[in-house]
Amino acid sequence: MAKAKFERTKPHCNIGTIGHVDHGKTSLTAAITKVLAENVAGNAAVDFANIDKAPEERERGITISTAHVEYETESRHYAHVDCPGHADYVKNMITGAAQMDGAILVVSAADGPMPQTKEHILLAKQVGVPTMVVFLNKVDQLDDPELLELVELEIREELSKRDFDGDNIPIIAGSALAALEGRDDNIGKDAILKLMAAVDEWIPQPERPLDKPFLMPIEDVFSISGRGTVVTGRVETGVVKVGEEVEIVGIKDTKKTVVTGVEMFRKLLDQGQAGDNIGALIRGVGREEVERGQVLAKPGSITPHTEFTSEVYVLSKDEGGRHTPFFANYRPQFYFRTTDVTGEVILPEGTEMVMPGDNVQLSVKLIAPIAMDPGLRFAIREGGRTVGAGVVATVTK
């Protein structure tokens, strides 16, 4: 049997299920694949057991279990990530191991929003998940329709509290189990189809890396006699054409220059684009004026900053992290893209110390500015050893 060729004709989107333990995230994931397999061509059902025994992956030295399934609606192709345990969600969202363009928040109608429901909403906000759709699961366990309304109000309140559009986010009530067992279509199959229609409509199509402004983290700098300075790196987003003006941002004062040549595998190109490993020849900049850790970027598209708030996961001892907690005035290195910068940590009010294995909101002051936007991932290191992973939530200075 020849392997089926993957024809990508539909736009692609990455989503995931989030929510409190045992509210039905994995059952819902299985139900979506089953209902779509029966209703939209090109889908295969994945059963609960196969999603639940998610393989362990290592992302930046952190052990994370995640299950990936794929499916498609009439209008989109989806990659869907589901995690077995709460700790896996925390690590996954902070490291960006599984990118989420949107999320399906699963809440059990019988319980309403629980501590992890709230924590996942906050995490989604902190790591830059743009929006979510809610599936109110297990509605067959509620006899009183008024209770359902109360739970819905409570969920909307939690979403608004974290600056999501709580008033308008679609909340679809149903039962993942009914859908899996093929009974009570109004809360089973039909609810799942309604949910996916809401996901199609409500979760915006992500911008492709190619369509974003040009950015290339600088990995190395060479000087070529008679030609000038060449910076090398992998283009992260956008396109750079020969003759275009760019900025060198971070660490030192921002400098403008012009890309006079683009080279890849020793061949000259007229442009470099997202995903390419290139050497860019830049005009009028000395070898000693550029360094690893800066970025080459479209003018005005990104600015350097020293202070930011972040969501951080601190590696446990078993993951090779610290064996002891850290306190206020902790000064590790923050590794952004290609380089380490020392920074001072400010703990949240009322927090005395942070233990290995915790996740925490930290404010950071760097000793040198780095080109950054919210959503930028970083590692926290001590003498070259990774002790934490984080993501910029807001830029403050």
Curated annotation (Swiss-Prot):
What is any one of the record's Gene Ontology cellular component terms?
A: cytosol
Gene behind this protein? tuf
Region G2: what ranges? 61-65
What InterPro entries does its record include? EF-Tu_GTP-bd (IPR041709), EF-Tu_GTPase (IPR050055), EFTu-like_2 (IPR004161), EFTU_2 (IPR033720), G_TR_CS (IPR031157), P-loop_NTPase (IPR027417), Small_GTP-bd (IPR005225), T_Tr_GTP-bd_dom (IPR000795)
Which SUPFAM superfamilies does the record associate with it? EF-Tu/eEF-1alpha/eIF2-gamma C-terminal domain, P-loop containing nucleoside triphosphate hydrolases, Translation proteins
EC number(s): the record gives: 3.6.5.3
> Which residue ranges are recorded for the region named G4?
137-140
The name under which this protein is listed is: Elongation factor Tu
The residues that the entry says bind GTP are: 19-26, 82-86, 137-140
Q: Which residues form the tr-type G domain?
A: 10-207
Q: Which Gene3D superfamilies does UniProt cross-reference here?
A: P-loop containing nucleotide triphosphate hydrolases (3.40.50.300), Translation factors (2.40.30.10)
Region annotated G3, chain positions: 82-85
> What superkingdom does the record give?
Bacteria
The alphabetical list of record keywords is:
Cytoplasm, Elongation factor, GTP-binding, Hydrolase, Magnesium, Metal-binding, Nucleotide-binding, Protein biosynthesis
- Location(s), subcellular: Cytoplasm
Q: Which PROSITE patterns match?
A: G_TR_1, G_TR_2
Q: Which organism is it from?
A: Sphingopyxis alaskensis (strain DSM 13593 / LMG 18877 / RB2256) (Sphingomonas alaskensis)
Give me the ranges of the annotated region G1: 19-26
Q: Where is this region: G5?
A: 175-177
Record GO terms (molecular function): GTP binding; GTPase activity; guanosine tetraphosphate binding; translation elongation factor activity
Q: Which reaction does it catalyse?
A: GTP + H2O = GDP + phosphate + H(+)
Role description? GTP hydrolase that promotes the GTP-dependent binding of aminoacyl-tRNA to the A-site of ribosomes during protein biosynthesis.
**UniProt record similarity statement:** Belongs to the TRAFAC class translation factor GTPase superfamily. Classic translation factor GTPase family. EF-Tu/EF-1A subfamily.
Q: Can the keyword Ribonucleoprotein be found in this entry's annotation?
A: no
Binding-site positions, Mg(2+) = T26
Self-association and partners: Monomer.
